[in-house]
From Swiss-Prot:
Residues annotated for [2Fe-2S] cluster binding in this entry: 158, 160, 176, 179
One Pfam family, short name: Rieske
Cofactor field: [2Fe-2S] cluster
Disulfide bond annotation, renumbered to this chain: 163-178
The protein, known as: Cytochrome b6-f complex iron-sulfur subunit, chloroplastic
Location of the Rieske domain: 116-212
Originating gene: petC
Similarity comment: family membership: Belongs to the Rieske iron-sulfur protein family.
UniProt KW Plastid keyword: yes
C-alpha cells in the first residue's frame, strides 16, 4: 500500500544523527508533511526574504538624501503660509544694486521710479504701500490724513527674523504673519517676539518730483532713542 512507503530507510547520516538524538523518522515525516500542507506559505516566505536581500545599495537613501526629502516636505507644508505673502513677493529678494550710503529714488513693485504727485492720486489718506527703498529693502510709503506724503518711510523687514510685515488696515497695525509680532501704524513694536521697532528712513521729494529715501540717523521720534539701525 501507498502508506507503507512513508517509512523511508534512513541514510547513514540520519542514523548518525539519531544516535545523538537529533533525528527520528517521525520528525522527518512530520517535517515533510508540514511542508506539503503549506506550500504557499513557504513560497511567500522565500519571496519576501528574496526581496529584502536583493535591494541594491544605491537604492537605500543615505542621510543626505533623507535630509533633502525632509526639507522638501517642510517646503510643501509651508506653502499655505507662503500664499499669504504673495502680494509682497516682489520685495523678498532685494535688488543687488541698491545703495546704502546716500539717498535713493523709491521704486514701485515693477522697478519704476515713484513720482510723488502721481502716487498721491492713486493712494488715499492712511495708505501704506510698499516701495523699494534703501539697500533694496521693502519700505512703506505713508500717506497722511491731509493727503500729503509722510516725511518718513517704514522699513517692512520684521526685527524678529526678517519676514516682510504686511499692513493691516482693519487693525491699523503692521501684523507679522510669521510669528505674530505687531507694530503700530508708525512701525513701533507693540507686541513681540520682535525686539525692536521697524527701521525708519527719511522720505523726501526731489526737484524732479520723485520720492527719495535717505538714511535716518537722528533720534527715533517714536521711542526717543538713538536709531538701532544706524
Amino acid at each position: 500500500m501507498a502508506s507503507t512507503t512513508l517509512s523511508a530507510t534512513p541514510t547513514p547520516s540520519q542514523l548518525s544523527a539519531a544516535k545523538n538524538g537529533a533525528y527520528s523518522p517521525s520528525r522527518a515525516l512530520l517535517g515533510k508533511t508540514a511542508r506539503g500542507l503549506y506550500p504557499e506559505k513557504e513560497m511567500v516566505s522565500r519571496k519576501v526574504t528574496c526581496q529584502a536581500t536583493s535591494i541594491p545599495a544605491d537604492r537605500v537613501p543615505d542621510m543626505g538624501k533623507r535630509q533633502t526629502m525632509n526639507l522638501l516636505l517642510l517646503g510643501a507644508l509651508s506653502l499655505p503660509t507662503a500664499g499669504m505673502l504673495i502680494p509682497y513677493g516682489a520685495f523678498f529678494v532685494p535688488p543687488s544694486s541698491g545703495g546704502g550710503g546716500g539717498g535713493i529714488v523709491a521704486k514701485d513693485a515693477v522697478g519704476n521710479d515713484i513720482v510723488a504727485a502721481a502716487w498721491l492720486k492713486t493712494h488715499g489718506p492712511g495708505d501704506r504701500t510698499l516701495a523699494q527703498g534703501l539697500r533694496g529693502d521693502p519700505t512703506y510709503l505713508v500717506v497722511e490724513n491731509d493727503r500729503s506724503l509722510a516725511t518718513y518711510g517704514i522699513n517692512a523687514v520684521c526685527t524678529h527674523l526678517g519676514c516682510v510685515v504686511p499692513w493691516n488696515k482693519a487693525e491699523n497695525k503692521f501684523l507679522c504673519p510669521c510669528h505674530g509680532s505687531q507694530y503700530n501704524n508708525q512701525g513701533k513694536v507693540v507686541r513681540g517676539p520682535a525686539p525692536l521697532s521697524l527701521a525708519l528712513s527719511h522720505c523726501d521729494i526731489s526737484e524732479e518730483g520723485k520720492v527719495v529715501f535717505v538714511p535716518w540717523v537722528e533720534t527715533d521720534f517714536r521711542t526717543g532713542e538713538n536709531p538701532w539701525w544706524s
